[in-house]
């Protein structure tokens, strides 16, 4: 399994829907990746609400909070991590992108994405191709798709190293 420094991070930029935050927390916990939240959030983010939003996954998730984008950028830069923005405006499809160990997948605010300055500071941007005429996916659905592609391309799913590629886990019903 990849060392913690080389596992991807999932990052949410100023999320404003608590249910999406909870889903991202669960996604991060189940896939054993850190969830970084760039504040301010559009909802109070205290211990009681964290527990409620993340159900029983809050304790298993590696949640890291950043006061603002500058603080987040400093943390990612300390570990020499590339920021990969998930954007409807990107030209590169997420499934044709060359992910690297330690990439940070950054999802924008549900209502507005990220400011141009944040987008410009990212090392890459990817999009999920959609049916013509439709705008976007739910932010956590998009993040899950991109994170899955990133992890699959590097053999980073929990158990991959022990199991090899012979067989995978089946979805629980």
Features from the language model and the residues they span:
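Post-transcriptional modification and biogenesis factors for structured RNAs
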Residues: 1-173
